[in-house]
Amino acid sequence: AESKSGEINTFVVDTVKVLRAKVNTVKLGNAHNVVWDKKRSYLYATATITGGVTALFRFKYDGNRSNPKLTNQTRIYTFDKESGGHDLFPVYGEEDKLWLTAASAVYKFDISTDVPTCEKVYSIADIKSICNGPDGILMLKPTEEWWAEGLVNEKGEELFKMDGAKIYKGRWMIDNLFSYPEKHDFVLGED
């Protein structure tokens, strides 16, 4: 997702030839973060729509490795007043749940049905990234523009700091089984 250009792009990727040029584009205002749902074969993304509010979108991926496309764009949730949808990431330990950070709060989506439900979890503004794991919640709250020198928990307690760093996202190093299989198959190019 490219927020400045408002696009979600697909690329042809080859493990031998590396990255090629983008092949297809979906316009989506201030597109931020995408998450693959391997169980349903959906791609989720946040964007800003008319009126400046944040919405959650769902796409299908056509599976074409030589000309990949996102299809069936569906807006599945629209906030009444929330703006600035930013991070979107699976909730560790809770099936069918996604974190979403926005301008004024952190939310949790339940996507187990076609019409997701949304719950405000933390009334903390401007969180740039969130994830959770066995060791708790990890957030990035910027101290300069869009970065910080460290990471905090949901109480604002510092968990990690590196002087001079410009950290944009923080993640626990744990398996993301919402998006990826337990075992990855290595596929070489087919030329």
Residue ranges of each PLM-predicted region?
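Short loop/turn segments immediately following beta-strands, especially the blade-tip
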Residues: 11-18, 58-69, 109-120
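Short loop/turn segments immediately following the C-termini of beta-strands
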Residues: 2-5, 48-50, 61, 93, ...
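Conserved loop/turn motif of beta-propeller repeat scaffolds
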Residues: 40, 94-95
